[in-house]
């Protein structure tokens, strides 16, 4: 008798995706982050659902409803901090996942890569709107500053900003719609994840060598299910250490002050995972130029496949490209640090230099070095 998992219409899909899926035999732990992102998404949806049961999306009660969750709801504090720090874990895994794709040349699978970029934008939008919901000082002013950037768009900018606000400033209408979008977008993300996996399973996974692994496949279960569970264990340990020992480590103290439109915080800054893009935005003196640079800092991922000049897919055997990849990583760390600093000397200059280096590395230096490596292959 045939196994039910191979005949049942629903279980057949699960079986071909997670059990009998042929996977390359040599994929390393850098390939764990896809499943970790799935786990993060599940944690965020579950904790978010429980938070939404007690949260009120109204400017007069939003802040106190979050306080109520932490003080009065059974285990409310743990749900709230799991959600807040879960977002940090989500972005940590996202950045590593994208970096892995760049390092090993996974961007050659264009549909999977492009859906991934759409996913990145959607997750960033969701996280931004979620940060506004507690209605603290940084929530309010962060929302004001970031939405105001759209006013830099010629002709329609001002109308667009007021349309998003639902009035002439960030107010009750803005909070209500941000809550609605923050609630619905994770389900949109889940749908996009399914499309992402659909396209991935059309081509099969890449591997560290960047070569075809058709001749050497192993079943996903039990080999990679066990491997993913180990990764999940490490992720949960890190998340629990954050939640139980220093839940506010990655947050901003200003967000413990209720939103006050009459008093601006000394340094308006987003959560750590947006700081690199915020630093690029601030490094350009012109408003429209800054907004364009901000969008391009992420959208540049879409043109990486077009900039590929190398004859080898992976960076595994390209030492010069490896060095540049880690220079780019260090540059992103510098941008993240600069984004959290005040706008004054020497931070302005460092931010501008790091921004120029970021775009130069991806657009000019890395493709040029790849061409040099092609020449060196002939020696």
Curated annotation (Swiss-Prot):
Transmembrane segments: 33-53, 77-98, 113-133, 178-198, 226-246, 288-308, 320-340, 347-367
Binding residues annotated for a ubiquinone, in chain numbering: 201
Cellular component, GO, one term: respiratory chain complex III
Co-factor remark: Binds 2 heme b groups non-covalently.
Superkingdom of the source species: Eukaryota
Bilayer disposition of the protein: Multi-pass membrane protein
Subcellular location: Mitochondrion inner membrane
Binding residue positions for heme b b562: 83, 182
Function: Component of the ubiquinol-cytochrome c reductase complex (complex III or cytochrome b-c1 complex) that is part of the mitochondrial respiratory chain. The b-c1 complex mediates electron transfer from ubiquinol to cytochrome c. Contributes to the generation of a proton gradient across the mitochondrial membrane that is then used for ATP synthesis.
Other information: Heme 1 (or BL or b562) is low-potential and absorbs at about 562 nm, and heme 2 (or BH or b566) is high-potential and absorbs at about 566 nm.
Protein name (record): Cytochrome b
Source species of the chain: Cheirogaleus crossleyi
């Amino acid at each position: 008798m045939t196994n039910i998992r191979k005949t049942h219409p629903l279980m057949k899909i699960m079986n071909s995706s997670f059990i009998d899926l042929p996977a390359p035999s040599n994929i390393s732990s850098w390939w764990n982050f896809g499943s970790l992102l799935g786990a993060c998404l599940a944690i965020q949806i579950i904790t978010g659902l429980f938070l939404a049961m007690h949260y009120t999306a109204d400017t007069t009660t939003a802040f106190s409803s979050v306080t109520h969750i932490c003080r009065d709801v059974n285990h409310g504090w743990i749900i709230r901090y799991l959600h807040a720090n879960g977002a940090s874990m989500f972005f940590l895994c996202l950045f590593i996942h994208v970096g892995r794709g760049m390092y090993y040349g996974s961007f050659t699978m264009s549909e999977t890569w492009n859906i991934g970029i759409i996913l990145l934008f959607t997750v960033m939008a969701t996280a931004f709107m979620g940060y506004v919901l507690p209605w603290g000082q940084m929530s309010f002013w962060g929302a004001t500053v970031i939405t105001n950037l759209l006013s830099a768009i010629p002709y329609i900018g001002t109308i667009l900003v007021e349309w998003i606000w639902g009035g002439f400033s960030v107010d009750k209408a803005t909070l209500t719609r941000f809550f609605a979008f923050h609630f619905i977008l994770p389900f949109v993300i889940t749908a996009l994840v399914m499309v992402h996996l659909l396209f991935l399973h059309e081509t099969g996974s890449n591997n560290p060598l960047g070569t075809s692994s058709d001749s050497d496949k192993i079943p996903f279960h039990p080999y990679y299910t066990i491997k993913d569970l180990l990764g999940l264990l490490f992720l949960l340990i890190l998340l629990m250490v954050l939640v139980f020992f220093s839940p506010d480590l990655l947050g901003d103290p200003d967000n413990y002050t209720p939103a006050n439109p009459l008093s601006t915080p000394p340094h308006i800054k987003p959560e750590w995972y947006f700081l690199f893009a915020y630093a690029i935005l601030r490094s350009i003196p012109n408003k429209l130029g800054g907004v364009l640079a901000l969008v391009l800092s992420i959208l540049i991922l879409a043109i990486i496949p077009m900039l590929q000049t190398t004859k080898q897919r992976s960076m595994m055997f390209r030492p010069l490209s490896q060095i540049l990849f880690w220079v780019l990583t260090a540059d992103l760390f510098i941008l993240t640090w600069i984004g959290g600093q005040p706008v004054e000397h020497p931070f302005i200059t460092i931010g501008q230099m790091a921004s120029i280096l970021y775009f130069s590395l991806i657009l000019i230096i890395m493709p040029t070095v790849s061409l040099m490596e092609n020449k060196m292959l002939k020696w």
